[in-house]
UniProtKB/Swiss-Prot annotation:
It is a multi-pass membrane protein. One of its GO terms (molecular function) is cardiolipin synthase activity. InterPro entries: Cardiolipin_synthase (IPR022924), CL_synthase_A (IPR030840), PLD-like_dom (IPR025202), PLipase_D/transphosphatidylase (IPR001736). Keywords: Cell inner membrane, Cell membrane, Lipid biosynthesis, Lipid metabolism, Membrane, Phospholipid biosynthesis, Phospholipid metabolism, Repeat, Transferase, Transmembrane, Transmembrane helix. It comes from the Bacteria. This is Cardiolipin synthase A. The keyword Protein transport does not apply. It comes from Buchnera aphidicola subsp. Schizaphis graminum (strain Sg). The chain crosses the membrane at residues 3-23, 38-58. It is found in: Cell inner membrane.
Length: 486
């Protein structure tokens, strides 16, 4: 019996070290950043068994066998469709403003499409008003409505959107709704799920979460896009989830969530529709590519002074493209750079780019919320304050709610708006979308909104920050170690 137990013991030890060796090998060949690699190596070596479990759950970017197979081929198929779109030469902006040229060229080479002009762009800054405008558009829809959200929380004005979709489906409009399984768990447990399905709305639970799936793929890869498409002509995107701002997470004590959305009329809806089609096919296996734009309608509203690039990031899409785009945008700044983000856990490259911009004379401002819904992110963000302040970056902490907007403004000309947070999960894992807008008039509107944010913020003082308590510095160092894992 003793021999048997000894055999089992040594077998467990052998398996354990084989797993350690295998994970070590995988970490080294992945060419991760050095801080990320070191964090993972320390985790698996210092925390026996638990470290291995953490790696299998969160260390590998793995969607699942079927979804991974579809995701690999889907973008190349979409590029074939993009080639058809290229026949509409008059909707593409070949020449951009000086500050936007490098970024648009990057997107052209990585995604195969020029910036799209001939769009009417509106910036929506109030969630209540945004949803009211959306409901009017839903009732005006004639052919199709597609939506994807990370969070749909029933209650309040969100129920008005549900009713508008139900009414539209009943009058023959083809309605599709894709919601993240984790973010919209309350929706899938509510009566609205069955009510909307019975009315004829196609609903997909994206990246399903369950105990079984823990062993099949990573659960922290989320569908984080926010997209609305109506009749292949009207499109919405930005940071807003489908929630009532007066009801959503009010118990957390952070106040109302502050968001930005863009409403666009024009051919960019087709480019966004291709992204939606890719996501739909990954989940269902069915293609729903949008119709090509109506040429006659587009010719009537041609706008030569602005253009939009759509950047899709996530598994199956061009690798690291959003990270490259952010770096290119920051290095393009010559006079002013204003960044708004709820979560500030940048990569080393982004941190270096931001600090370098300030050190070469660019006026750099970062606006973040004073109050957070995540303790982990709050402390992880604080780690970077000292280096940013030393470089001359101004850090503003928004006081009037949880600032959830994600935007970048460069030299009052180039704007980036979308779903991407400046954290590792948005940069490397999630399905995200970013609109790059080369339009001075739109940028002035965004600048006015960012000024409102700053007016309702407190400026973090460099000297005061340097005198913070010693115990907070220790906590910051701990979270600095964890930041590559967030």
């Amino acid at each position: 019996m003793d021999i048997f137990y000894d055999l089992i013991k040594w077998l467990v030890v052998l398996i354990y070290w084989l797993l350690i060796a295998n994970i070590t090998y995988r970490i080294l060949i992945k060419r991760r950043s050095i801080p990320s690699s070191m964090s993972w190596l320390l985790t698996i070596y210092i925390i026996p068994f638990i470290g291995i479990a953490i790696w299998f759950f969160f260390g590998e970017l793995y969607l699942g066998k079927r979804q991974k197979k579809i995701a690999k081929k889907i973008w190349s198929i979409s590029n074939t469709y993009l080639n058809k779109l290229k026949s509409y030469k008059y909707i593409f902006q070949i020449k951009n403003s000086e500050v936007a040229t490098s970024l648009f060229q990057l997107c052209k080479h990585r995604q195969g499409i020029y910036g799209i002009k001939n769009n009417k762009i509106t910036l929506l800054t109030n969630t209540q008003n945004t949803i009211e405008v959306l409901i009017r558009d839903i009732y005006s829809a004639r052919n199709n409505i597609e939506m994807v959200f990370y969070i749909w929380k029933p209650g309040g004005i969100a129920d008005d959107v549900a009713m508008a979709l139900i009414d539209s489906a009943k009058r023959g409009v083809h309605c599709r709704l894709m919601l993240d399984s984790a973010g919209s768990v309350e929706f899938f447990r509510s009566p609205w799920f069955d009510i909307m399905k019975k009315s004829g709305i196609e609903i997909v639970e994206a990246l399903k979460v369950s105990l079984i799936r823990i062993f099949l793929r990573r659960l922290d890869v989320r569908q984080h896009r926010k997209i609305i498409l109506i009749d292949n002509y009207i499109s919405y995107s930005g940071s807003m989830n489908l929630v009532d701002p007066y009801l959503f997470k009010q118990s957390s004590g952070v106040g109302q969530w502050i968001d930005l959305m863009t409403r666009i009329e024009g051919p960019v809806a087709t480019a966004i529709g291709i992204i939606y089609s890719c996501d739909w096919e990954i989940e269902t296996g069915f293609k729903i590519l949008p119709k090509l734009p109506n040429k006659e309608m587009l010719k009537k509203k041609c706008n030569q002074n602005s253009s939009i690039q759509v950047i899709a990031s996530g598994p199956g899409f061009p690798k690291n493209v959003i990270h490259q785009a952010l770096l290119t945008a920051i290095y393009s700044a010559r006079n002013e750079l204003i960044m708004t983000t709820p979560y500030l856990v940048p990569s080393d490259d982004l941190l270096h780019a931001i600090c370098t911009a300030a050190q070469r004379g660019v006026k750099v401002s970062i606006i973040i919320p004073l109050y957070h819904d995540s303790i982990l992110v709050k402390w992880a963000s604080r780690v970077f304050f000292s280096e940013l302040l030393e470089a001359g970056v101004k850090i503003y902490q928004f006081k009037k709610g949880l600032l959830h907007s994600k935007s970048i403004l460069i030299d009052q000309q180039l704007s980036l708006i979308g779903t991407v947070n400046l954290d590792m999960r948005s940069l490397w894992l999630n399905f995200e979308i970013t609109l790059v807008i080369d339009d001075r008039k739109f940028s002035h509107h965004l600048s006015a909104i960012q000024k409102e944010y700053i007016d309702n913020s407190r400026l973090l003082d460099k000297n005061t920050w340097s005198m913070r308590a010693y115990w907070t510095r220790i906590l910051e160092k701990i979270f600095y170690f964890l930041s590559p894992l967030l």
